[in-house]
A protein has these predicted regions:
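RNA pseudouridine synthases
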Residues: 1-152
């Protein structure tokens, strides 16, 4: 576990792809448990350690997660997220450049929009993206800008 920032109110951790932030039906040990263990050991805390989950990242996503170390910090961060005061930025590394319907969108500075319809299968604990409208699905739009290329 990599701690990026820590003070008396929050702790920011670099979540790896494949980890879950909070417990779910899979029974896999969540990142929040590892952070609690870290805090308990570092500060020699007896008993339970408070740790508030302020937001989540999906299992396949790597990135920074902010946890609250106090209930007051959790309330403030929840309010900030609810009021849109927190701006999230996602960077994706793809094998091939994205293609817009006109065949553009792969050059640096260019971009586009990808639209999918999302469905969830609770029994499989999986979500699916469809490239066409599906009854009961939630429409999801992703606006992107290409920021670089690699020779790889």
């Amino acid at each position: 576990m990599e701690v990026i920032y820590e003070d008396n109110h929050i702790i920011i951790v670099n979540k790896q792809s494949g980890e879950i932030v909070q417990g779910d039906k899979t029974g896999d040990r969540p990142l929040s448990d590892f952070v609690k263990d870290y805090l308990k050991e570092k500060y020699h805390k007896p008993g339970a350690v408070f740790l508030g989950v302020t937001h989540r990242l999906d299992r396949p996503v790597a990135g920074l997660v902010i946890f609250a170390r106090t209930s007051k910090a959790l309330a403030r961060l929840n309010k900030m997220f609810a009021e849109g005061q927190v701006h999230k930025t996602y960077w994706a590394i793809t094998q091939l450049p994205p293609q817009s319907p006109a065949g553009q969108g792969g050059n640096t500075g260019q971009g586009g929009t990808v639209t999918h319809w999302l469905t969830r299968n609770e029994q499989q604990n999986k979500s699916y993206a469809h490239d066409h409208e599906v009854p009961g699905a939630k429409k999801a739009m992703l606006h992107y800008t290409v920021i670089g290329h690699s020779n790889r």
